[in-house]
Amino acid sequence: NKIIGTNSDFAVFSFYATKNITCGEGGAIILNNKNHYENIKSISNNGMTKPAMKRFENNKYSHWDVITKGFKANLSDINASLLEKQIKIYDQKMIKRKKIYDNLYKKISNIKSITLPISNSNVLRDYHLFPIGVDVKKRDKLISFLNKNHIQVTVNYRSITELTYYKKKYKFQCSVSEKWGQQTLSLPFHLKINKKDIDYIYSKLNSFFRR
């Protein structure tokens, strides 16, 4: 019964535009060490000791300093303001996302040429994407076919061992992730998908594999 992010020293969450909780661009780091917390705050604000809002407190001005190399990576107030309401209704949205996911899963599971990820009943999912696996030789043809039929699909995740930078830097293989990365594509999945959409996606997938 542990929440994700509580089993490690650090956990990183993305609030990118396509995520279930979004502020357009940005993210959050959760950690359990005060020293690391202060360091990360500084690094994310150009290595400064104090952000602008902290330089004048208790009627006294505090001069700032730069104590380390840093980045301009702190979240703006405007971006942050978009998160509060979404977090409050997160559980409510997840119920709807799960229902859509289950309906799509049930429909597509009838197509034997498609591999679907196995869910663990002991783990609560976020239902972020709907990835499927297909024959490597047919994957890119299926992507073109679906896009021509106005079903926008994409490949979200590839094995990093097959990406040029990491392939050159690290000499190792991850056979399972490589195999899945070559087979996978993500179907449309969002809160506005309805039964008609699911039936249409299914019909096009079915027609492709019946050819």
What are these regions (language model features)?
Residues 14, 27-33, 84:
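Short beta-strand-to-turn element immediately C-terminal to the catalytic PLP-Schiff-base lysine
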Residues 20-24, 123-126:
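Short glycine-enriched loop/turn motifs at secondary-structure junctions
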Residues 16-19, 32, 102:
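Charged, amphipathic alpha-helical interaction segments
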Residues 2-7, 29, 171-173:
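Short, hinge-like loop/turn segments at secondary-structure boundaries
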Residues 34-211:
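PLP-dependent aminotransferase class I/II
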Residues 1-23, 62-67:
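Conserved active-site segment immediately N-terminal to the catalytic lysine
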